[in-house]
Amino acid sequence: MKRTIVIPALLLLAASAVAQTTSAQTTPAQTKNPVSTALRDILPGRQKNTVAAVEAMPADKFNYKPSADQMTFGRLVTHMVETNDLLCSKAAAVPAAKVEEIKDTDSKDNLVAALKASFDFCSDALAKMDDSKLEETTEGFGGKQVTRAWISMVLAGAWSDHYAEAAMYLRLNGVLPPTAKK
């Protein structure tokens, strides 16, 4: 009888030890700046996919809009540039990028260059960011005071949202989005 209790108990103990060892091996290393580190880690993939999506859209489709109420693809790209410049500067507490004004009707080459420059600005800004300023407030949308942590979360969400929008525009024009090609 004791044997029937001891053997399962030992097996359970061994399984628990293996699970803890496996868990410890897959847990990411602790960092003093988890939010800013996460943004820096996420940025290269979002940049690669978003720039590739914009580059994939034929130049003659930059004036395409899915419906009368939606923005053109060119406007979507200028929105991405404006968002990157604004949110990366606010999240990292650095001055906004000094860039030439772009228009929705600019050439594809100009819009792609502006988008790349905005992601480069984000990379530089986020390299200076640390989590010690996340509790600081800054002006958000509509003049509302928000924390840099709030801005950081909106920034990460915006990158995903913008790629998803670009992918939808591509599909509506018969173009396969970059992440669908894998």
Q: Could you tell me what each predicted segment is?
A:
Residues 40-44, 48-54, 61-100, 139-182:
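Short, contiguous alpha-helical
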Residues 5-13:
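Sec-dependent N-terminal signal peptides
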Residues 49-52, 56, 117, 121-128, ...:
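Solvent-exposed, charged/polar functional surfaces in cytosolic regulatory/catalytic domains
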Residues 14-19:
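N-terminal signal peptide c-region/cleavage motif recognized by signal peptidases
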Residues 1-2:
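N-terminal secretory signal peptides that target proteins for export/translocation
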Residues 20-38, 82-144, 173-182:
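Short, helix-capping/interhelical loops that line the mouth of catalytic, cofactor-
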Residues 60-61, 132:
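Secondary-structure boundary/capping positions in well-ordered alpha/beta enzyme cores
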